[in-house]
Amino acid sequence: MKLLVLAVLLTVAAADSGISPRAVWQFRKMIKCVIPGSDPFLEYNNYGCYCGLGGSGTPVDELDKCCQTHDNCYDQAKKLDSCKFLLDNPYTHTYSYSCSGSAITCSSKNKECEAFICNCDRNAAICFSKAPYNKAHKNLDTKKYCQS
């Protein structure tokens, strides 16, 4: 039941932030590709200053820096003419990628915006796989530790 509530909350949060729930699930699957035993939404949501919705201040560690870089990548995507959030973009249509072993490959058939977002997610997932996870940074008091 708790997982169902979490899934609903994440879907609402994703929709509110302009990212379709499908895009969030794709990013989750990418993380599971490179970290097979992980539970991305439970482990990485509300981690540090940047993992989850929003972000501010200085990242608390390498993993949090991965999330900050991912946020910045999405900000860059929004500046692309092909990502002007009309009808054909990865926020409303999913991108194509494959996972073989722990290798993620974004499809060459993706359009420019889809390819950009796919690579944002791919690079973040790989970054997550290389960064240590510090349980003390989960559900961090962002008002105390993440002010600019």
UniProtKB/Swiss-Prot annotation:
It comes from the Eukaryota. It is an enzyme of class 3 (hydrolase). It catalyses: a 1,2-diacyl-sn-glycero-3-phosphocholine + H2O = a 1-acyl-sn-glycero-3-phosphocholine + a fatty acid + H(+); 1,2-ditetradecanoyl-sn-glycero-3-phosphocholine + H2O = 1-tetradecanoyl-sn-glycero-3-phosphocholine + tetradecanoate + H(+); 1,2-dihexadecanoyl-sn-glycero-3-phosphocholine + H2O = 1-hexadecanoyl-sn-glycero-3-phosphocholine + hexadecanoate + H(+); 1-hexadecanoyl-2-(9Z-octadecenoyl)-sn-glycero-3-phosphocholine + H2O = 1-hexadecanoyl-sn-glycero-3-phosphocholine + (9Z)-octadecenoate + H(+). The active site is at H70, D121. Regulated by bile acid salts. Up-regulated by cholate and down-regulated by taurochenodeoxycholate. Cholate-activated rate of hydrolysis is lowered by hypolipidemic drug ezetimibe. GO terms for molecular function: bile acid binding; calcium ion binding; calcium-dependent phospholipase A2 activity; phospholipase A2 activity; phospholipid binding; signaling receptor binding. One of its GO terms (cellular component) is extracellular region. This is Phospholipase A2. GO terms for biological process: actin filament organization; antibacterial humoral response; antimicrobial humoral immune response mediated by antimicrobial peptide; arachidonate secretion; cellular response to insulin stimulus; defense response to Gram-positive bacterium; fatty acid biosynthetic process; innate immune response in mucosa. The inactive pro-form is a homotrimer. When anchored into the cell membrane, the inactive homotrimer is likely cleaved either by trypsin or by itself, producing an active trimer. The resulting conformational changes are thought to open up a center hole forming a channel for substrate entry. Interacts with PLA2R1; this interaction mediates intracellular signaling as well as clearance of extracellular PLA2G1B via endocytotic pathway. Coiled coil: none annotated.
